[in-house]
């Protein structure tokens, strides 16, 4: 069974024993979990309406975003990471809303309500899409971890999955 949610939702489900394993985007508090850090990095950027001037850019800078209506994640640990990227300009941003999952924020972007700060792989713009992704510059990247409860006894299938994952990352 696949379950989608933000890191806080996924960790809560793991803690309650409702799911065995979670795939979480950093930054995230993983102190009470066993984890495997994946090798790839996710890229931060802006989800913009395809017709906007921002959509025509190769990348966006702090200066490009200062006056735009922005939607950002509701996760405070990630907001702190974004604030570090913006430095002293963060307090001058026009943040109009927060989101827990990018899907609804992307719909708001599509309807011209604002621009969402997001990870690239969380949206899947097609040729018929009304939104696009433009990376931040300087580049902001984040890692991904696979987590599970410490000292958890798993089914043979889950145990095998974790071992296969560990083996594949050693190769």
Task: Please give the residue ranges for each predicted region.
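Flexible hinge/capping segments at coil-to-helix
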Residues: 30-44, 48-70
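Secondary-structure junction motif
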Residues: 55, 68-90, 154-163
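Extended ligand-binding regions for polar small-molecule ligands
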Residues: 63, 143, 147-171
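Beta-alpha-beta core module
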Residues: 30-37, 41-43, 103-151
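Central regulatory/effector-binding core of bacterial HTH transcription factors
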Residues: 1-30, 98-99
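Short helix-loop capping/hinge motifs at secondary-structure junctions, enriched
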Residues: 51-61, 78, 138-140, 151-157
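A local structural motif
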Residues: 1-2, 87-97, 130-131
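Short loop/turn segments at beta->alpha junctions
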Residues: 6, 61, 100-101, 119
């Amino acid at each position: 069974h696949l379950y989608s949610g933000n890191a806080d939702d996924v960790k809560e489900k793991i803690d309650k024993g409702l799911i065995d394993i979670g795939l979480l985007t950093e930054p995230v508090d993983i102190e009470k979990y066993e984890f495997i850090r994946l090798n790839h990095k996710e890229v931060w950027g802006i989800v913009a309406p395809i017709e906007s001037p921002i959509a025509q850019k190769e990348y966006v800078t702090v200066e490009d975003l200062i006056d735009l209506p922005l939607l950002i994640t509701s996760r405070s640990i990630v907001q702190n990471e974004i604030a570090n990227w913006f430095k002293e300009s963060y307090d001058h941003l026009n943040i109009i809303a927060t989101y827990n999952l990018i899907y609804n924020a992307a719909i708001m972007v599509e309807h011209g309500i604002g621009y969402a700060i997001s990870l690239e792989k969380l949206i899947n713009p097609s040729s018929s899409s009304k939104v696009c992704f433009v990376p931040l510059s300087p580049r902001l990247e984040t890692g991904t971890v696979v987590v599970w409860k410490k000292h958890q006894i798993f089914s043979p299938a889950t145990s095998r999955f974790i071992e296969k994952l560990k083996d594949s990352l050693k190769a």
